[in-house]
Amino acid sequence: MSHLVDHTLVVELAVRNPFTGKVFPRNGTVFAVVDTGYEGFLLIPGDVFEELFSELESEKRELILADGRKLISRGVYGEVLLGRKVLEGFVETIEGLDEFVTGIDLLKSFRIEVDYCLKSVRLKGCR
């Protein structure tokens, strides 16, 4: 499910470690901000990353921000539960992050229709 929250596009999702079966949140979903400038799959807060993926060896990656600054992320491959779809991709975190952020790698499987006049959002799978 997707929404506009204060004119910000968000999607409802849950994150799962495919190796341990741990899911966050345990019940329900969280809002993740849609960021079309982020080319990755999913950014999550550090405490959630530790809760779900602490047993796995993480990989470091460099992220380049729009202003040219560079950040180092760490991540692992995980799953996103989005409605009835299960999507696999690189789930990462950066220091100080306190929200969930979806990127192009996750969104490329969907058609997104946003109508700010009607305050409506439709998210539909490509297939």
Language-model features, listed with the residues they occupy:
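Pepsin/retropepsin-fold aspartyl endopeptidases
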Residues: M1-R127
